[in-house]
UniProtKB/Swiss-Prot annotation:
It catalyses: chorismate = 4-hydroxybenzoate + pyruvate. InterPro entries: Chorismate--pyruvate_lyase, Chorismate_lyase_/UTRA_dom_sf. Changing E156K: Loss of activity. The keyword Ribonucleoprotein does not apply. Its EC number is 4.1.3.40. Keywords: Cytoplasm, Lyase, Ubiquinone biosynthesis. This is Chorismate pyruvate-lyase. HAMAP family: UbiC (MF_01632). Pfam families: Chor_lyase. It is an enzyme of class 4 (lyase). It comes from Escherichia coli (strain K12). Disulfide bonds: none annotated.
Length: 165
């Protein structure tokens, strides 16, 4: 099962440098904190619509593979993050199987919990980079994050109803 927003997320073209954009737009795109929290600050109830979750092989993550360790399997989670039931963001998380040990096993059991609620409660969370991307007028970003030094890649596409626009 897929969703058109996730197809568009995978088509994002990334900027080599941070583009000169409106400061309010950059504030959203370069946010270091939880996007879930930012959406809740808009006075909205945030929920997750699960699109796909499970183990995949390298051939299913061609866009992410160069940014992650080469492994036999990866945990893939694709969701829509909704505010008061309206989709504001499409998210795709790719986690190498080697990351899924110790406390990070919880990444497989998030269910309808937003990823940000888990990630941003961890004292071991670090971010290697944020890249800004665009496709067909929609903005997105991807970040390589680390929990206890173990990598995962998060890609987010801001949907038309998002307050980013």
């Amino acid at each position: 099962m897929s969703h058109p927003a996730l197809t568009q997320l995978r088509a994002l073209r990334y900027c080599k440098e941070i583009p000169a954009l409106d400061p309010q737009l950059l504030d959203w795109l370069l946010l270091e904190d939880s996007m879930t929290k930012r959406f809740e600050q808009q006075g909205k109830t945030v929920s997750v619509t699960m699109i796909r979750e499970g183990f995949v092989e390298q051939n299913e993550i061609p866009e992410e593979l160069p940014l992650l360790p080469k492994e036999s399997r990866y945990w893939l989670r694709e969701i829509l993050l909704c505010a008061d039931g309206e989709p504001w963001l499409a998210g795709r998380t790719v986690v190498p199987v080697s990351t899924l040990s110790g406390p990070e096993l919880a990444l497989q059991k998030l269910g309808k919990t937003p990823l940000g609620r888990y990630l941003f409660t961890s004292s071991t969370l670090t971010r290697d980079f944020i890249e800004i991307g665009r496709d067909a007028g929609l903005w997105g970003r991807r970040s390589r994050l680390r929990l206890s030094g173990k990598p995962l890649l998060l890609t987010e596409l801001f949907l038309p109803a998002s307050p980013l626009y």
